Amino acid sequence: MQGAPLRHDWTREEAEVLYALPFPDLMFLAQATHRRHFDPTRLETASLLSIKTGGCPEDCGYCSQSAHYDTGLKATKLMDQDAVVATARRAKEAGADRFCMAAAWRNPKDRDLDQVCDMVSAVKDLGMETCVTLGMLTPPQAARLKQAGLDYYNHNVDTSPEFYDRIITTRTMQDRIDTLANVREAGIKVCCGGIIGMGEEVDDRLGMLVLLANLDAHPDSVPINMWNEVKGVPVNDTAERPDGIALARLIAVARIMMPRSVVRLSAGRQYMSDELQSLCLLAGANSIFIGDVLLTTANPQAERDADLLTRLGMTSSLSARSVAAVDENVSANA
């Protein structure tokens, strides 16, 4: 059952009404929506690898990889393809459904894109879904990635249009929207979400969801990131972690507004109790990253994730016998 047609005309006021519903009503509506489109007992698991770390020319105020800030992070060159494929193979053995590769660039140079395309093709040969995040893309670059077999491209809007300029000045929101359009036009699935806990208001979080839901096509994946603490960046001065109920409400609104999108409970899970993560899954989140490092910041250990899923009676490709391989895989490339 697919339910009502997807909407692309949400208003901020409608989002506010949903968010303010009595909590039991909001959770019921979100879970009912979730069940119309997904198996509520199934969780998608992905693995994330930084294939080129640090030295980014953008000034994103939350990011440890920006060259504008002294975060103590050493910039690296693009990883060797053999090392990337070996990491992907271990991630698959450990239970990952999808392998995501991230490079700290404003936009990829052609010679670098050639190497990334080769990586994508090689990972696809392992039988995994592929995702990359490389910064802004032109239409020809998106077409090259599609030809290489890329499944998903991640390019977040980060926050609401109103709060955006307080966080980033070197790339406009329209730059991001243009890249999303180029990716979609090339036939690649879109992964696009944002970050909460940077000092924005609830209205900004809802504004971000309205922006995403009103794109010409809903993102196929919507990652909701809680800001990971990073020393030396401007967001340190404004950051305020949302309480658990606020996070669950936001997940629920995302599920209702974008009913067929995968909603990923992404960065920041190490700050969440098992009970809060369970509440977010009940609200409609149905994907996580596995492994104990996300790019440059911490993530819950795989043993904890596997144990939680067992206690919840949920299933994923992550199994108790494979968690050691997950942690070994990610730690070797931290």
Curated annotation (Swiss-Prot):
UniProt pathway annotation: Cofactor biosynthesis; biotin biosynthesis; biotin from 7,8-diaminononanoate: step 2/2
SMART domains for the chain: BATS, Elp3
Molecular function, one GO term: iron ion binding
Catalysed reaction, written as an equation: (4R,5S)-dethiobiotin + (sulfur carrier)-SH + 2 reduced [2Fe-2S]-[ferredoxin] + 2 S-adenosyl-L-methionine = (sulfur carrier)-H + biotin + 2 5'-deoxyadenosine + 2 L-methionine + 2 oxidized [2Fe-2S]-[ferredoxin]
Binding, [4Fe-4S] cluster: 56, 60, 63
Positions bound to [2Fe-2S] cluster: 100, 131, 191, 264
UniProt keyword annotations, A-Z: 2Fe-2S, 4Fe-4S, Biotin biosynthesis, Iron, Iron-sulfur, Metal-binding, S-adenosyl-L-methionine, Transferase
Domain Radical SAM core: 41-260
One Pfam family named in its UniProt record: BATS
Cofactor: [4Fe-4S] cluster; [2Fe-2S] cluster
CDD domains: Radical_SAM
Gene Ontology biological process terms from the UniProt entry: biotin biosynthetic process
Cofactor note: Binds 1 [4Fe-4S] cluster. The cluster is coordinated with 3 cysteines and an exchangeable S-adenosyl-L-methionine. Binds 1 [2Fe-2S] cluster. The cluster is coordinated with 3 cysteines and 1 arginine.
HAMAP family in the cross-refs: BioB (MF_01694)
Family (UniProt): Belongs to the radical SAM superfamily. Biotin synthase family.
Biological role: Catalyzes the conversion of dethiobiotin (DTB) to biotin by the insertion of a sulfur atom into dethiobiotin via a radical-based mechanism.
Summary of subunit composition and partner proteins: Homodimer.
Stated name of the protein: Biotin synthase
